[in-house]
Each structure stands twice: as C-alpha cells, then as structure tokens.
C-alpha cells in the first residue's frame, strides 16, 4: 500500500454532527457555567478491568465541563456477578446480598441446591427481557434493596439521564444482560419524564447467534423516545437509521478521542524502563521484560479470542513468531481480563506483557508510542491512534473493529480473523511492513484524523444541551 492510499482524507460515509477544528474549543479549555443541569450518568465503567475504562473517564470529564454529575450507575451493575443488587425476592436479606452473589458463582456446585430453592420460591433477577417488567421489579423491590432505591432516587432528582452505551447493545440470543439493563434504564427515565440520551454507543445484531427480534423491538420502542442517540461508528448509525427510523440518531466519535491532547507531545512517552508502570501486585514474571528505549510493536487480544483461550494461545504464538521477524521488540498488551491467555503466550515466548491493571494513562502511552498495534480491541486501538500508531484490526464480536477503521479513515477496512491462520498471518506481516515503511508520514496522517475526531467528540456536551428541549 502506498503512502497516498494509507488513509482517506475526506470519506463520504461519515455523517458528522460536530463542528470543525477551527470552530471548536479544546475539551480541556471548557469552563463550567454558573448554573449547571444535574446529570444521572449510567454506565460509568471506570472500575471495570478493561482498558476501555478510559472512555468512561473521558466521558465523565466531558460531562463535568458543562453539567453536574449528581448520580452514577457503575458498569458493575450490568453483570450479575458484580452487581450490588441483582436478584430480588430472595430468602437472604438484601443486607447480605454480597453473600448471595458469592453463592451464585457457577463454580460453587455445593450450593446449587440452595439457588434452585430460591428460584422455586420466587427469587429472580430484577432485570427481565421486557424493560417494562424490569422497572416494575425495581419499583416493587426498591424499599428492600438500598442499591435499587439509590438508582431510582438519583434518576428522579436529575435533570437528564446520560447512558454510556459503549459496546453493550448487541441483539444476541439469549439477550445480554448489559443490553437489557441499559434498556431498563431508558424505560425508567421515560417513566420519570426525564430527557434521556444514549451516547457513545455501538448497536448491532449478533454475528454469532443472529438477531434477537424481541430485544430489537424493545429497543426500537425505547430509543425512539430518547431525546437523541449518538452512535460511535458509522455502521451503528446505518443500522439504527435502517431498523429504527423513528430514532433521532447521529454520529459522534467515541469519548476516548477527547484525550488526544494528553498524547500529542513527547511528554506522554512511557518510561524507558517498563518496570515503572507495573501495577500492584508487582509479579516476579513481569520484571525486566519491558524496555521502551527501543522501537517496539504491541499485540493485544480481543473478545472473540478471549472466548476461546486455548485456540487463541496457539494462533497468537504463531502471530508473535511472524511479527518478530520484522526486527522490532514485541510486547503483549492485556487489554481486558479475558485477554489473560496472553500471559501464557508471554511465558512461552519470553515476552514482556503490559498487565490489564496498569495505570490507564500509561496503558495509552505504551500504545500511542508503539510502531504498530495489532488487536481486536476497540478502545486500545483508539489509544494507539491518539499517538499516530497504525493499527491492524483483528475480528471481534459484531462490526466494531471494521467500523473503527472507517472512523479512523483507513483505506483498508479489513478485519483479519481473530485466530489468524498461516495465510492470514502472512498478510498481516505484509500489511505491517507497508505501514512501518511509511514511517512518520503515516503517523502524522493518523494523528490528524484522531485530532479531528477529538474535536468532534468534545462537542458532546453542547450537543446534549441543544437537544434538551426536544
């Protein structure tokens, strides 16, 4: 691929709602207004063991420039295994719900009889397939569950609700609890007559199980009643415009792009000695493996790869061997807890690994200053792009990686297989070599696109205010 074909300068397939660079203030330069509307922020994923937590932090910062965040629901609520309140109608008092949640763990077969008894006596997850039923459950049980009462009260006291859709709205069978939780929160906002905004979202059918028409029907009903829905990628926008034409939808890039200014100069480089970024507990096998004084390539995981760790270890082992032939140091980046298979690859190949729990700004720094990043992870690929690092995209669930290549204006929108075989690995190496040969010319172009996306993402607060009155 020639340098002139590496990126498209003026793609016609992105519908932009934000202002141009010259019309937009830096996100960090925004000043709070004297009286600010109160926001209930649903989907704050900062506590999630995933590098995508940076996007939630960036979104919270964007909202805080213009609004007062008076309530939050963390991403922990989306999953039963971590939710502060999930099952209702249990024999166990809500005061001891953490004990019940502990017993729910599928690995605790000794207590399976007790969970079956609870089900028989009427215990259930308050999140149902029908969002209306979910909120009926919340209202019926909030007097016994302080966590549910807190959700209701925070929503009631807010002036508007902002939901971070992230990559959680996929119409799979069975339905994802994350999807159902978000739809339930929209239902709650509508019942309370609050302006509801779904932002930062991907929306798609499930490529593995096909479309869940029941969940799609619920989403169509609820999203049409949101003030507006902002999608983070063009394919999600096209999907909503086709399947939910009554929904007021727009494209606004992911909030993580708003962190561009943090990585646009040399002060953002990782420490030359990578031991300085190791998180607690500083495991012995991590020490002495990361040297950022020399050019390096990073390889990350992916949701699809993480779902089949044995297969992933084999495929990534071959990929590492092939990429090492390019003459650069190779480091693995554990971008999510399900990327733990990379720890085994690192041990077998003697490679350094950046742990999932490393400080998030340092995680971004490692990727932003790599020579190349190969991954099936959405937000880590954005981190890389903030510094101009070219990306090679591996497949993941739904369309997110291929669509990200459109957001970043790549000419090549290809997603390679999550478990690349020998022929695909050869193509990956060939593409990598072409990107590396283009050097700083390509990196400048990528940074220019990321900078434009940062201006657009920083317009989100003004976008919300414009739609407050319908």
Residue ranges with predicted function:
Residues 2-470:
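Active-site anion-handling motifs in enzyme catalytic cores
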């Amino acid at each position: 691929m020639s340098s002139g074909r590496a990126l498209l300068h003026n793609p016609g397939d992105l519908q932009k709602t934000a202002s141009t660079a010259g019309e937009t203030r830096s996100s960090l330069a925004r000043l709070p207004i004297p009286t600010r509307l109160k926001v209930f922020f649903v989907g704050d994923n900062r506590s999630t063991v995933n590098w995508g937590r940076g996007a939630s932090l960036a979104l919270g910062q964007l909202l805080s420039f213009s609004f007062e965040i008076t309530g939050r629901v963390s991403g922990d609520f989306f999953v039963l295994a971590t939710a502060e309140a999930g099952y209702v109608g249990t024999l166990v008092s809500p005061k001891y719900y953490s004990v019940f949640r502990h017993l729910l763990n599928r690995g605790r077969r000794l207590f399976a009889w007790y969970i079956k008894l609870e089900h028989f006596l009427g215990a259930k997850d308050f999140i149902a397939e029908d969002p209306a039923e979910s909120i009926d459950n919340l209202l019926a049980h909030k007097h016994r569950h302080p966590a549910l009462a807190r959700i209701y009260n925070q929503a009631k006291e807010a002036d508007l609700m902002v939901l971070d859709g992230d990559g959680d709205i996929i119409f799979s069978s069975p339905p994802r609890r994350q999807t159902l939780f978000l739809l339930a929160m929209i239902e709650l906002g509508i019942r309370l007559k609050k302006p509801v905004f779904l932002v930062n979202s991907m929306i798609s059918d499930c490529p593995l199980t096909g479309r869940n028409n029941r969940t799609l029907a619920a989403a169509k009903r609820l999203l049409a009643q949101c003030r507006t829905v902002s999608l983070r990628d063009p394919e999600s926008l096209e999907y909503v415009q086709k399947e939910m034409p009554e929904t007021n939808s727009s494209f606004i890039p992911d909030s993580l792009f708003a962190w561009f200014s943090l990585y646009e100069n040399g002060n953002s480089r990782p420490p030359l000695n990578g031991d300085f970024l190791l998180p607690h507990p500083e495991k012995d096998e991590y020490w002495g493996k990361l040297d950022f004084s020399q050019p390096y390539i990073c390889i990350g995981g992916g949701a699809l790869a993480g779902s089949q760790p044995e297969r992933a270890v084999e495929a990534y082992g071959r990929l590492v061997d092939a990429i090492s032939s390019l003459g650069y140091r190779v480091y693995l980046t554990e971008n999510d807890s399900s990327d733990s298979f990379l720890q085994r690859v690192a041990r077998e190949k003697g490679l350094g690994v950046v742990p999932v729990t490393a400080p998030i700004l340092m995680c971004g720094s490692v990727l932003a200053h790599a020579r190349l990043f190969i991954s099936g992870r959405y937000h880590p690929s954005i981190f890389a792009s903030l510094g101009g690092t070219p990306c090679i995209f591996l497949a993941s669930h739904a369309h997110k990686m291929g669509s990200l290549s459109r957001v970043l204006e790549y000419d090549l929108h290809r997603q390679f297989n999550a478990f690349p075989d020998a022929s695909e690995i050869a193509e990956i190496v060939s593409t990598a070599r072409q990107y590396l040969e283009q050097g700083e010319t390509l990196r400048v172009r990528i940074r220019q696109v990321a900078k434009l996306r940062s201006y657009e993402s920083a317009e989100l607060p003004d976008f919300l205010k414009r739609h407050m009155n319908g």
